[in-house]
């Protein structure tokens, strides 16, 4: 039986040292829970919406250095986290040192990488470039690396192979946020990983998607539909890990709502973490009992412990708050976080009697002590 930790942490944008400390605390807590592998969000050290801080070499180097301290802290545990990957010998389109939005995986102080990977980290394949997502401005995607190496991008994707203290092997198919939202792209990282697994006869025990996904009304329901379909089609559990917090790129201020979720191999939700809460939650996986004519039963299922014995974890009904409730929760959390980040303790509102000022006054009345 394997214990996977859902590391839904609050990330402070532009503060790698504070985020490093948060991650180290999460790792120590995970060790106390006897978790085998802790999964953390995308760009967990830097934050996601940080604007042109990516153009500052000192900031990027600090993110890399803080990542190295995380790697060193992985004695007796595996940790998967998002950070910036750096290749100082090459340049981005803007002439600055080449950066990647990347997944790092470490165990017992050493990096774990797919044998196909051209770097000691996993590069994001699909970089979004719409609305306030502007990754193409700062990061080089995997297809560009494949083109430079004169290799198909499929060859550079692979699994993270872990071996835990009980001798169990556990193969993870790693994806970064947009890599799962591939319906409008010509290439599907998810399908590629699944096809390679089948061809090479190497099982995928879980798909993971680490994300920095801002709150958008209705997005959680769309996400559930996406990952339910993927888990059911692939007959494999899916772990979606998102961050919480407030981030600001200078133009847009976004709340990150978490709601990290685990889907079993039937696409059913078995765990969903609360919105806007920082939490490390263990999830048990147990090998499925063999069933005739079902090759997938060489895999793992989501489990509960009952009287010390693993049982199948049942699906849960996830209540969907009303749209006004979701909007209010996002506004309340966002205002509270913004005041905390800026140190503002008092608000002056010119109340005109109109709906705008009245709504603001009502909102701040619920936020201010």
Regions found by a protein language model. Give the residues of each.
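Enzyme catalytic cores with a strong preference for nitrogen-chemistry domains
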Residues: 1-350, 358-369
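Conserved G/P- and acidic residue-centered "switch" motifs that form tight phosphate/ATP-binding loops
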Residues: 354
């Amino acid at each position: 039986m394997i214990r996977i930790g859902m590391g839904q942490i609050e990330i402070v944008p532009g503060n790698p040292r504070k985020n490093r400390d948060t991650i180290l605390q999460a790792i120590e807590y995970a060790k106390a829970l006897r978790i085998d592998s802790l999964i953390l969000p995308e760009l967990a050290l830097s934050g996601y919406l940080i604007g042109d801080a990516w153009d500052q070499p000192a900031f990027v180097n600090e993110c890399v250095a803080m990542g190295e301290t995380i790697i060193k802290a992985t004695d007796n545990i595996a940790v998967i986290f998002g950070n910036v990957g750096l290749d100082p010998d090459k340049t981005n389109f803007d002439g600055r040192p080449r950066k990647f939005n990347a997944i790092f995986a470490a165990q017992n102080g050493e990096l774990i990488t797919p044998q196909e990977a051209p770097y000691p980290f996993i590069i994001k394949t699909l970089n979004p470039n719409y609305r306030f997502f502007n990754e193409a401005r700062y990061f080089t995607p995997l297809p560009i690396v494949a083109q430079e190496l004169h290799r198909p991008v499929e060859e550079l994707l692979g699994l993270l192979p872990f071996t835990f203290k009980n001798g169990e092997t556990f193969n993870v198919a790693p994806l970064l946020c947009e890599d799962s939202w591939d319906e409008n792209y010509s290439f599907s990282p998810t399908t590629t990983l699944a096809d390679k697994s089948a061809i090479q006869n190497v099982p995928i025990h879980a798909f993971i998607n680490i994300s920095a996904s801002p709150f958008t009304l209705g997005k959680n329901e769309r996400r559930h539909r996406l990952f339910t379909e993927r888990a059911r089609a692939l007959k494999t559990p899916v772990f979606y890990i998102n961050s919480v917090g407030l981030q600001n790129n200078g133009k847009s201020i976004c709340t990150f709502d978490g709601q990290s979720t685990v889907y079993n191999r039937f696409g059913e939700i078995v765990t969903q973490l609360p919105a806007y809460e920082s939490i490390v939650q263990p999830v048990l996986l147990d090998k499925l009992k063999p069933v005739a004519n079902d090759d997938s039963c060489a895999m793992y299922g989501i489990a509960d412990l009952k009287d010390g014995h693993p049982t199948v974890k049942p699906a849960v009904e996830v209540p969907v708050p009303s749209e006004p409730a979701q909007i209010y929760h996002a506004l309340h959390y966002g205002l509270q976080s913004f005041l905390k980040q800026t140190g503002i303790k008092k608000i002056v509102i010119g109340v005109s009697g109109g709906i705008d000022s009245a709504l603001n006054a009502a909102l701040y009345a619920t936020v201010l002590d």
